[in-house]
Amino acid sequence: MILAGEERARTITDKPVFIRGTGQALDGFQLTSLHEDYAHWPALKRAAESAYRMAGVGASDIDVAEVHDCFSIAELIAYEELGFCKKGEAGAFVAAGRSDYGGDVVVNPRGGLIGCGHPLGATGVAQAAEIFAQLRDEAGPRQVPGAAVALSHNNSGMGEHVVMIYGRDA
């Protein structure tokens, strides 16, 4: 993976992948507070909205996503905050197969953090590498057919979230 401007990228490869949008937001959490709502991550929602706006896409345009699933509930919360489904519907979204091949969006085709490991400091790079492979049609048996727009979500602790939108087109 090489980061380069659009013009240079087109001279390096005939299958460039472009970063089309980014968003970052931070919320403070008091883990000792009984008043915090840990099932909603407003910073993730703000980061996603910013990335979608910059990329000129919405949640329904995403073909494949790598989300930060450091524990099972984190993935479900991410589905809702990223706009893949409505609040309170993540369980039904997964049960209906909407986050799998043939569904609305294929999430974590390489197994996510739970399936592949969570190397602190390198997780985001691993996610980007999977997105890169997907958008270049180089993901082998994990390949999402026709993937053209992708998303990665990473977070630090519970309060800082980064969302990136990638595409085959600039």
Tell where the protein language model's regions lie, with residue ranges.
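Short acidic capping loops at alpha-helix termini that bridge into adjacent secondary structure
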Residues: 58-63, 87
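Active-site-proximal alpha-helical scaffold in enzymes
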Residues: 1-7, 119-139
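Catalytic-loop motifs flanking and including active-site residues across diverse enzymes
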Residues: 40, 44, 71, 121-127, ...
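Condensing-enzyme catalytic core mediating Claisen C-C bond formation in acyl metabolism
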Residues: 1-46, 50, 98-110, 114-116, ...
